[in-house]
Amino acid sequence: INVGDGDTAHTGGAVWENAVISTAIREFVYRGGGFIGVGEPAGHQYQGHYLQLADLIGVEKETGFTLNYDKYNWEEHKNHFILADTTKPVDFGEGKKNMFAYEGTEILVQRDKEVQMAVHEFGEGRSVYISGLPYSFENSRILYRSILWSTHGESLLHQWFSTNFNVEVHAYVKNGKFCVVNNTYEPQNTVIYRGDGSSFALKIEANEIKWYAV
């Protein structure tokens, strides 16, 4: 996961001029690993690119050097696994401007022809791009689904899982216990999935914590 503005310590800055580092990341993802970039991941103007992993991420920032490139990929894929639990337009906070997608990249959200969220397959691996992700219960679910999708872990979704993103499941398998936590000041209804995939419906009161045996 690489998060932050370009040319900062958070994303790496000039470190990305080191081919050993960029090659290692590409090799990791190409062989089946996952990559999540938020903001301007690997952002540093060098050798004609701003995002130094643009080929991996499938997204690049327009900084004036590619104005003459045709940019036809703007179709949104709103039914993607990552967006399945969203209840409203995704909150990207400040987001990022001038981001465009390469051909072969799936755009999940674009606004005024500026990419806000996209996914891309790179070899056997996958990457997720998000322009910004301020904390909220809904965005936390988006991040969780992004992690699962980028690591080919979609089948693991319904393990220690709450269908309502306002409610969390914490499993302490070695101790034989798990708890369900309502993070809100209102009662919530949800379906809880255990580690084996079995489930049960639950109504949980405001701020309530319920404990169960595994």
Regions found by a protein language model. Name each.
Residues R26-V29, G37, Q52-L67, A101-E106, ...:
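Extracellular ligand-binding/catalytic regions of CAZymes and related secreted enzymes
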Residues T11-K88:
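A glycine-rich, often tryptophan-bearing local segment used as a flexible ligand/cofactor-contacting loop or short
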Residues G6-D7, A42-H44, S136, P187:
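Glycine-rich nucleotide phosphate-binding loop and flanking beta-alpha elements
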Residues L83, P89, K96, V180-V181, ...:
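Intrinsically disordered, low-complexity peptide-like regions
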Residues G4, I82, K96-M99, A118:
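Compositionally biased, intrinsically disordered low-complexity segments enriched
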Residues P89-T105:
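Active-site Gly/Thr loop motif
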Residues A9, D91, S127-I130:
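Generic preference for well-ordered secondary structure
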Residues I1-N18, L133:
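The substrate-binding groove and active-site-proximal loops of carbohydrate-active enzymes
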